[in-house]
C-alpha cells in the first residue's frame, strides 16, 4: 500500500481483519487491534518518502513508517515463546496507579490510564526529557514493573501536553514521531505464565532536539495567536453573526509554546 500513489506519504498504517467491524467505530476497532496484537512480532517498520511538512523526519521528505498488524492470527502465525494474550489475565486499570508512577519517576508529568478501562492496553505518559536516551531508559524501567505485564503499548508525549486530553495528546504524539527511529521494545519474563515472555512497545512522541536526540533540523513551534489578536477577535465576535461565542483555540495551546519564535528555542 505504501507504493500506491499518495499512500507513499503515510506514516502509520493499521491493518484489521475484514470482520473487525466499522472502521469508524474507533473504540471497538482499537479493542480488536490490541486483542490481536503482539508488540514484538506484529509491528513492522520501514522507511520511505514523507510529506515535506513532516517535521519529525531526520531528513527532509524521508522518514520512518510503521504498519500495525491487528488482524486475527492463525495458529501457525503465533510465536509460542510469547504470552499469547497479554492483558487477558488481569485488569490493568486496577493494578497501575498514576500517582505511584509519578512518585517513582519524577520526570513524569501526567499519566493517562483511561484506555485500560476500555480494554485497550495502552498508556499515554507526559514526560520531561533532560538527557539523551531518556525516554528509552524510562520505558525500560516502566516496562519492567510487574503491574505493566498487561500493557502492550506506551505513548510518550511532551511534558507540556495534557496526557489526559486524548485527541490533543494523540495529535501531538503523531506529529512528533518517526516510528522507525522512535520505538523501543521492552521484553520481560512473564510473571504469570511460566516460560513465556511479554512485550511492551514504547514510542517517543516528544519533541526532538540536537542536545538530547542528535536531531539536526529545526523543530517548529506550535502555532497560536497572540493575546492582542485573540482580544481583537473576541471584541468583534458579535459583529460576525456566526453563532454563539467560541473561545480562541489558541488559549488551550499557549502552555505548549517553547519561546516566541517560529522555531523551538
Task: Map each language-model feature to its residues.
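Charged, compositionally biased interaction regions
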Residues: 1-265
